[in-house]
């Protein structure tokens, strides 16, 4: 692909922290998060749900810990999954300490509702002792009373002031491994608050539109809000909040990042909405391909266009392309060039095979290049030693 300046996004410069093995902020990739909706005390169900999210590509998972039974179960959950776990804590400072001891990689708290300064000190000590990061989670629906009285309602100034007050509490304890979120269900409020916060601090930001709604409504609201922020370079880690299964949140989060070219994973399908000119059933073909190609993680682009109006042009910019043609024959493109024609029968199977083979070649080539680079580095090191 050619270099296109209009596609470049300059990300906000932020401090880098670590949530377990995942770097957040700085030049680290924007991580995708979700949250379980099982009872945390049901460790088996929670682990199964996290594993489904892992298959979808999640980087970090948040788990609610409302009681001691949950923090007890958390230890098993952390042990059995492959991604860092954030323990969601409200009000009960002991739960935060227990979660840190259980192996949580991050504690999601509001220092202001944990209790006395002594309790905050104990939580910070537990986080430091166990290598936990902290997420300061400000939400328009649970702002402190004094800020509501000061501003009259949740607004960007109130959210940012709350976030900075909480950040100062941690900084006063010489704790700096934290990220901040200022979420709201209103897209305008959330975006404005994040933009304002991004201008006054360099802490990594967890972005999200809270209580966004069901699958369709929540996806649209999140795409508008998060897409706006990410396009402006704001955001180091993100969650799409949906009234849906966690893996669906992960899928949508990845699609937002892929749409902006910020991360790449799996097959990106470019397809037309179809019309009377289509040479094959585009909608059914795309649905089948999305399902059949979901297992591929190697970044690839695939165009599925029903006719020759836009098909050849789209195929120029994709790894593999399909354009509907006449007489029941359709053109397959490889790397933007015409390659061969195919009939509708068996077309989906054929494209799946082409994509799988190309993905396998890319993996092999990348592995070979990595091995060659490592070999060259070893030889250079040996040569340096003999000089």
UniProtKB/Swiss-Prot annotation:
Residues where [4Fe-4S] cluster binds: 272, 275, 307, 314
Gene Ontology MF, one: iron ion binding
Xref: SUPFAM superfamilies: Inosine monophosphate dehydrogenase (IMPDH), Nitrite and sulphite reductase 4Fe-4S domain-like
Pathway stated in the Swiss-Prot or TrEMBL entry: Isoprenoid biosynthesis; isopentenyl diphosphate biosynthesis via DXP pathway; isopentenyl diphosphate from 1-deoxy-D-xylulose 5-phosphate: step 5/6
Keyword 4Fe-4S: yes
Gene3D superfamilies: Dihydropteroate synthase-like (3.20.20.20), Sulfite Reductase Hemoprotein, domain 1 (3.30.413.10)
A GO BP entry: isopentenyl diphosphate biosynthetic process, methylerythritol 4-phosphate pathway
Coiled-coil boundaries: none
Catalysed conversion reaction: (2E)-4-hydroxy-3-methylbut-2-enyl diphosphate + oxidized [flavodoxin] + H2O + 2 H(+) = 2-C-methyl-D-erythritol 2,4-cyclic diphosphate + reduced [flavodoxin]
Key word Ubl conjugation present: no
EC supergroup of this enzyme: oxidoreductase
Cofactor: [4Fe-4S] cluster
Family to which the UniProt record says this protein belongs: Belongs to the IspG family.
Protein name as annotated: 4-hydroxy-3-methylbut-2-en-1-yl diphosphate synthase (flavodoxin)
UniProt organism field: Granulibacter bethesdensis (strain ATCC BAA-1260 / CGDNIH1)
């Amino acid at each position: 692909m050619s270099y296109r300046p209009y596609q470049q996004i300059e990300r906000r410069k932020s401090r880098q922290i670590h949530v377990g093995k995942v770097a957040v902020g700085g030049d680290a990739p924007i991580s995708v998060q979700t949250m379980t909706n099982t009872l945390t005390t049901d460790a088996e169900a929670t682990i199964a749900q996290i594993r489904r999210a892992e298959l979808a590509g999640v980087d970090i998972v948040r788990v609610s810990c409302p009681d001691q039974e949950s923090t007890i179960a958390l230890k098993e959950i952390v042990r059995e999954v492959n991604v860092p776990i954030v323990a969601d804590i409200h009000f009960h400072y002991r739960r935060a300490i227990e979660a840190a001891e259980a192996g949580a990689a991050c504690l999601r708290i509001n220092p202001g509702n944990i209790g006395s300064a002594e309790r905050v000190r104990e939580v910070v000590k537990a986080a430091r002792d166990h290598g936990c990061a902290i997420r300061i989670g400000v939400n328009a629906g649970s702002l402190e009373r004094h800020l509501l009285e000061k501003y009259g309602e949740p607004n960007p100034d109130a959210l940012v002031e709350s976030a900075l007050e909480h950040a100062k509490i941690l900084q006063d304890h010489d704790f700096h491994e934290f990220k901040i979120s200022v979420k709201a269900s209103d897209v305008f409020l959330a975006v404005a608050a994040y933009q304002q916060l991004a201008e006054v601090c360099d802490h990594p930001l967890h972005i999200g539109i809270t209580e966004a709604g069901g699958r369709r409504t929540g996806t649209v609201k999140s795409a508008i809000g998060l897409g706006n922020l990410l396009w402006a370079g704001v955001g180091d880690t993100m969650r799409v909040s949906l009234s849906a299964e966690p893996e669906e949140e992960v899928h949508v989060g990845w699609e937002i990042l892929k749409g902006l070219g910020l991360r790449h994973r799996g097959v990106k399908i470019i397809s037309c909405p179809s019309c009377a000119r289509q040479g094959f059933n585009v909608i059914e073909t795309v649905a089948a391909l999305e399902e059949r190609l979901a297992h591929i993680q190697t970044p690839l682009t695939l165009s599925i266009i029903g006719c020759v109006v836009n098909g050849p042009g789209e195929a120029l910019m994709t790894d593999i392309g399909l354009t509907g043609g006449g007489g029941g024959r359709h053109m397959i493109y490889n790397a933007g060039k015409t390659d061969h024609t195919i009939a509708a029968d068996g077309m989906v199977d054929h494209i799946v095979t082409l994509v799988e083979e190309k993905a396998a070649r890319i993996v092999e080539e990348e592995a070979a290049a990595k091995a060659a680079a490592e070999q060259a580095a070893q030889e250079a090191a040996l040569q340096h030693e003999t000089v």
